[in-house]
Amino acid sequence: MATTGEKAIYEDQNNVNIIENVVDVANGINESPKTLFEEDGSSRDSGVSMTSCSDKSDASPEEDVDFSKLESGRVALTDCSNFVSILQRNSSVSSSRSSSFYNYDTPTGRKMKTVFDLDSLDHSEYEKRVMSERPTDNHRKRTSSSMSPSVTLLDRKRSRNLSLVAPQSDKSCRYNGLNNPRDDPFGDEDDEVFEQSNVRNSQVQNTSIFAQPAPRTATSLWDLAPPMFFERKTSDTSGNGSFQERPKQILRAMSVGEIDSELPPTLEVKYTLPGVDNPQRESQAFRSISPTTLLLEFQRLGDDFDKKYIIVDCRFPFEYKGGHVKGAINLFRHDKIKPIFFPENGEASSFQNRVPIFYCEYSQKRGPTMAHAVRSIDRVLNELRYPHVEYPEMYLLDYGYKSLWSTAECRQICEPCSYIPMTHSSFSMEFKSARLERHHSMASLKPNGETSHREEKKKRCTRSVIRRNNSSLNMLSRSSSALTSTGSKTSSMENILYGLDDERRPKWVSAFDIQSTESENDLDAALIYQRNISSNASNASSIVNLAEERIVQLGLQVITPDFPDRPSESSSTTPAGEHLPLGEGGHQIPCGILDFSSISDDAE
């Protein structure tokens, strides 16, 4: 128990102060506490100074102090020193952390962390003067990195504690990557350039509650780089109020296109027949009607039905012959669309001003495809008159001929009154042939409805056959001339091959020119004609005369008849080049002998 005049020292760690209470138990005296240690607001590192605040004059003499009673006081002072050191170290770490978040000396707005506290560095006289004259409200705004809950709570506690320890620092920061212009040490302080910059920078309000870091003590290389202007904008969609940094020079490209106020007109079709509620195939090119609607239209118009409507059966020919709607035409090839619906040379089509009605067996594939093909060709041919078309109103028989045949009352408009399915076993070959023909017609169809693929292919094949026939006849003539020639010409195989390898077109004249397909009667007539000419001539020159030569058209295949035996050498009675009469020997096979001995490559 403490006696009179004894001093009990208690440690108040919450207020970071050491309080001395003088208690006089006997006399009931409790003196007001005296602070042994107080905060030094003018301290350079904003820490807690351990300066004694008990007046030296009030201190009791050394001889009046019981040192044994002050042991607890020394322990308390040691604990207080340790606590203040920890607090000062935490303050330094927190200050370095906040300075790393609030330095915008780099284009990215971040600076490398340092282990030194900038507040503990000494500054020159010029920097101190600049710091004292700089406006106190020129502070930066907070960034999104410092808005995390843990960092914010930690900084608020530190700020509350530091508000009791030291006032806010007057050091300002650089805002948005711009270097705040300092007072010109070599010129007039009233320069308009520096004044305007100071006024502009002083308008930035401080939203931070932390002690600001000290300015740099040396010139960085980033000061020499051109300034980057950043614009901070609070995100409207962000829940935590984060900021977005965007350079002012990089503007977002915005579209300046304008939508045309007047859109092109659309095709408005006034259908006269009612459609079905739930059609099997929906399309903007046609409307689906039921078999009952078609029957009622037949009964209403009677014989005038063909004058208003044209029914198009898109099935294969064997299906069409097995049963179709009265007055329907069979059209399953797409290359026949243009000649029927869009005739050329100004001829008026028999289908113009008539409404087409398409159908197939089920109206799922062939019928709708044919209707779309007609509309597509119509669009191409009337491209300059859009949206005009020649056949705006078109219909499709819903569920096709199968549905019409299934309705007993509608069978009266079928002709003949029967129905053959597409997959009927008796017409498998006709089905395969018609399907292949339909596919070829679709492949050769052009957007404008023309089909020249097959015709061009036929022309190429004809020219190829003519070239092969001419080449064969040329080779036959050269071989015969080489084998029957004497004197300077040799019959060796080398000379024959050498002549065949010559790519030049020879100047020889053949007795027959193969060009196209004809019958054998033309061959007989040509042979008789050549025999009559040769009887009036003394030599075979008339055979090779171009003016008197008769061009004979033979077939693609040359049939070599069985010639009768003839002497090895031509007799003097038989003129060279004269043909033997047909039918010699009692048979009707055309035969003849051609003597090519007088014909050479140099004949003119």
Swiss-Prot record:
Chain ranges of the Rhodanese domain: 305-413
Region (Disordered): 33-67, 127-188, 443-464, 562-588
Reactions catalysed according to its record: O-phospho-L-tyrosyl-[protein] + H2O = L-tyrosyl-[protein] + phosphate
UniProt protein name: M-phase inducer phosphatase cdc-25.1
Stated family: Belongs to the MPI phosphatase family.
GO MF terms, alphabetically ordered: phosphoprotein phosphatase activity; protein tyrosine phosphatase activity
Organism encoding this protein: Caenorhabditis elegans
GO biological process: cell division; G2/M transition of mitotic cell cycle; meiotic cell cycle; meiotic spindle organization; positive regulation of G2/M transition of mitotic cell cycle; positive regulation of G2/MI transition of meiotic cell cycle; positive regulation of mitotic cell cycle
EC number: 3.1.3.48
Any one of the GO CC terms: nucleus
Pfam families hit by this protein: Rhodanese
PANTHER family: M-PHASE INDUCER PHOSPHATASE CDC-25.1, M-PHASE INDUCER PHOSPHATASE DUAL SPECIFICITY PHOSPHATASE CDC25
